[in-house]
């Protein structure tokens, strides 16, 4: 039995050709061969009772009969005597699993199988990548999923979201409220700015209007100061509407004198009657006293008839009861001149016109000499009976009276006692007639100019009153006083752009008045009518170089009434 086993083992070996084919197949497909060797090893381990055909090529051993070194092994040794298949079972199958891979394939089929092997390799690598990705995911999932009960995180997240929404809602509300407040503030500031701009526009227009008026008044003042003495009153706009009747042939104009300064005192006849009673016939010249000078009026002369009483009927008839001599009055001289000239062709209108033009000629404004004044012409009228010179209104009245007299009446009736004049009015009113009361009336032109312009013309043009002693008698003897430089004074006043004649320390500005008003307790309590107070202060306000000011006395009076 031992010999059979040894012979069996020696007969189960490959020939050299078979070995070459086996090596070629193994070398051409080495990686699959390794896998197959691994499989064979695993099968050999799992199945130890397998046949020798199942042995791996790594454990291949040459049989003793195949080895040439041994004697008797020159051939295969498959002789009739040495056949190993004497007791061989013919039903033995030599095809074990995987035996087709032990022998190399044909050359024509190698590329296709190599391509298939490449695809298999690619598929295997892909499968390995997919399996590795799955394993990584499974490992990540296992790392994330820790054992134990998971906490409930749904409630805190919802609560946090609700808090965030509430905070955002509150922030939006605050932002909208802030924007609304800013819009209201902008509207209020815009309205205040519009009101301030409107008020500034009104104030600016008022200031411009005041400046225009100031320039207009300065122009008028410059016209008055730069114009000549003759045409000074022509600068006033309404002066042309004040032309007197009968002066159209004379360019000279003058402001109508006051009632108490009317020329021609013989109209009132007071001085003449008084001089007839007090002066002898051989007295001195009429210029010795004011009571003898015609044109000078006093309170005593106006009321002289009250002291003396009414003239008697005999005096009215031309018979004088006073034996004292009388001075020839200007009235009688004029009456005689008018009686001698009654036959001339001089009409009352022309005589009154010439009389008025002669009365307007005064010292310094008329080209004629002083000898041609009405006072000297009165003396000339005694000698020249044919001259039509009527210096007063009494001349016209005397002429009309002389014409109306009958031839049977003597002419010396007018030489004895003159007419009562205005003394009759004083007697009718019970002695209460006072012409000075009518001197306060002025022309409407004074409302345009300031109150100081009334004295301005008296100082700028010092013309003596018509009928005054200085005009009639002293115009040659007395020299004129030096005139004031009123133009320089006016220029100085115009340069000072401040409130004239006002003490700056006594003036209160608007801020000071407001501070004083805020210090009052009634103002803080709201008990003071601010509108009424402002209207009263506005009436007392004045303009100055520093703004609107109010006199301190006026402010104290208004504040005192409020308290």
Curated annotation (Swiss-Prot):
The keyword Membrane does not apply. GO terms for biological process: cellular response to stress. The keyword Secreted does not apply. Depending on the oxidative stress inducing agent, yap1 can undergo two distinct conformational changes, both involving disulfide bond formation, and both masking the nuclear export signal, thus abolishing nuclear export. GO terms for molecular function: DNA-binding transcription activator activity, RNA polymerase II-specific; transcription cis-regulatory region binding. Contains two cysteine rich domains (CRD), referred to as the N- and C-terminal CRD's, n-CRD and c-CRD, respectively. A nuclear export signal is embedded in the c-CRD, with which the nuclear export proteins interact only in the absence of disulfide bonds (or otherwise oxidized cysteines) within the c-CRD or between the c-CRD and the n-CRD. Transcription activator involved in oxidative stress response and redox homeostasis. Regulates the transcription of genes encoding antioxidant enzymes and components of the cellular thiol-reducing pathways. This is AP-1-like transcription factor yap1. It comes from Aspergillus oryzae (strain ATCC 42149 / RIB 40) (Yellow koji mold). The lineage of its organism: Eukaryota, Fungi, Dikarya, Ascomycota, Pezizomycotina. The gene is yap1.
